Design a protein with these regions (language model features):
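PAPS-dependent sulfotransferase catalytic domain
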Residues: 1-125, 135, 179-232
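Hydrophobic/aromatic-lined pockets within catalytic cores
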Residues: 46-50, 118, 142-149, 162
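PAPS/PAP-binding and catalytic site of the sulfotransferase fold
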Residues: 124-149, 157, 165, 214
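Structural helix-adjacent loops and short alpha-helical linkers that scaffold large soluble proteins
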Residues: 149-152, 202
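Short, glycine/acidic-rich hinge or "gate" loops at secondary-structure transitions
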Residues: 153-157, 229
Length: 232
């Protein structure tokens, strides 16, 4: 990875799922955090987990120098989603978290960035806002990064990040798309919508999530994760 970054001639970027307290923070680097309703995060995670090839999970668990608990293979079938939500809400892979199984707690992850959202080199972006106003959010991100907008090609860029465009170009757009990680690479881009959990999990489960989000994140962050809205 480091060799790839060193070889880039354009601006370097790293995508990570690490919380802010899990990375080295530098004033000269700009950070973008993308938030989402935790119930939507679960739906996306559930699809990715069941779409990963078992041999890939095994290889990740046995990578040289790997630290931390192993990633579990999916428990049951993709249709067992309601039981999976209960596990996600009440189990953890790490001693310092109480939820997020089998990967990490989205709520803890979001809270670490939220605490420092006032810093000039942290931009808070919400998935819902990206869907509703793709053009506006792309311009906001471009301004934050100091990237000039070329109006001659701008609409092509906006069209290029649409769900249908990325799904049709999944081998190039999906993480690991060219590395045979997924059972179905195009299924990495599964739906690209929010609120799919409605009618899938029960009202009791949804309420349990809302209660946990309020406890772990506080009212402001819990509300932002659910509804979005620009922070500036």
């Amino acid at each position: 990875v480091l060799a790839q970054l060193e070889g880039l001639t354009n601006r370097r970027y790293i995508k990570t799922h690490l919380p802010l307290d899990g990375i080295r923070f530098l004033d000269e680097i700009k950070y973008i955090f993308v938030g989402r309703d935790g119930r939507d995060v679960f739906m996306s995670m559930w699809n990715h987990w069941h779409n990963m090839k078992p041999e890939v999970i095994h290889e990740m668990n046995n990578a040289p120098g790997r630290q931390g608990p192993p990633i579990s293979l999916p428990l049951g079938g993709v249709e067992d989603i309601a039981a999976g939500f209960d596990d996600w809400l009440s189990r953890s892979s790490f001693d310092w978290e109480t939820n997020g199984f089998p990967f990490f707690s989205h709520l803890h992850h979001a809270a670490t960035w939220w605490e420092y959202r006032h810093l000039p080199n942290i931009l808070m972006v919400h998935f819902e806002d990206l869907l509703k106003d793709t053009d506006g959010e792309m311009r906001r991100i471009s301004e934050y990064l100091g990237i000039s907008v070329n109006e001659d090609i701008w609409q092509d860029l906006v069209d290029g990040v649409s769900f249908n465009s990325m799904k049709s170009n999944a081998n190039n757009m999906a993480p690991g798309g060219s590395q045979d990680i997924w059972k179905d690479t195009s299924n990495f881009f599964h739906k690209g919508t929010n609120k799919r959990w409605q009618g899938v999990i029960s009202q009791e489960q949804s309420s349990a999530y809302a209660e946990l989000a309020l406890k772990e994140c506080g009212p402001e962050l819990a509300q932002w994760l659910e509804f979005g809205g620009r922070m500036d």
